[in-house]
Each structure stands twice: as structure tokens, then as C-alpha cells.
Amino acid sequence: VLMKVALFIPCYVDQFYPQVGLATVTILEHYGVEHEFPVSQTCCGQPMANSGCMPEAEPLARKFIEVFDGYDYVVAPSGSCAGMIRTHYPDLFADDPAWLERAAALGARTYELMSFLVDVMRYRPTGVTFPATVTYHDSCSGLRELGVHDQPRALLAAVGGLEMKPLEGNDVCCGFGGTFCVKYPAISNAVVSEKADA
């Protein structure tokens, strides 16, 4: 039985980093994951929720649930957006049992890309080489809301010629923080500079 996989491309990927969305498609296709891109998808509501505007986030969450309801899995190249769906959608509908059930069910089927590849598909790269020294920074939302920690490391460990160097404070915020970098750019830049110097 083929599973129905939907690709969710977050707003910032769509608007600022479309190459990340295209790379996600390339990765899914490389591993034989048949997927669809629902053209009626919209923002998950995270920017509004992060800004404390929960009433504005709720209609977006309803639309999102309706669009992705018929899929076995929803895959996103974003830990923060997947975290919004999995962790925070149930909070939006705490007073509405029918929508709460739908939100929780969708959250359980929503994955950040690396987690989907490792935890659901059980994939590991084979025949891939990249002779370089690299480090890895944990996404705050991916790590804290989704438990994405070992998955990216497992994928990187399977790459031939790759040397992994531990990043000091790899679990410390990079300064992006969703809307934090927009609201507090000076603090955000200072945090990312410290991270880059590590």
C-alpha cells in the first residue's frame, strides 16, 4: 500500500529560500517517496501565534488541517513549522473537541524532513561521499518540540569522507527564533555572531 505524503513548504522557505523547497523535493524523489504538493496550502499560523495573536492563527490552522487532512504524512523542511502543527495546534483548539481531535491527529502525522527520512522511512544515504569537515547546529524547535537530535546525525554519519566536529553549545539558540529575529534584530545578530564564532 502506497502512503500518501504531502509536502508542506513553509512561508519563509517559499518566499526567501525556494531552493530549500526544491532540494526537499529532490531528496524525497531520490528516496522514492511519492508525494503531493497541495496547492491550496497556506501559512501554518506560527508567526501569528509567536506574536501572541492566537485568534488570527486559528483560521489558518483550520485551513491547514482541512488541506492536509487526507494525507498519511505531512513533511516539512522546518522544525519550527512542524512543531507548530504537532505541539501548538492542540492548544489552539483546546475548547473545541472536534477540531482538537483533528489537530492532534494531524500533528501525529506531521514530520520535519530529517525525522521523516530516518524515523518513518528508515533511510540512510548509501554511496554518498562528501570529503569535508562539518558541524551541526540543532534547531531549537526541532530539538525541543519534535525531539529531532539523532536523526540528522545518523544521516550525516552515513556520508563517506565526512568528518563531524562537535559544535560547542550546539543546542543553544542561533538567534533566528521565528519572529524574534524580526522583532529584535540587534539581539538576534549578536546571538548568531556568537554562534558563528564557535
Feature map (PLM): residue ranges:
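Iron-sulfur cluster-binding electron-transfer modules in prokaryotic oxidoreductases
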Residues: 2-198
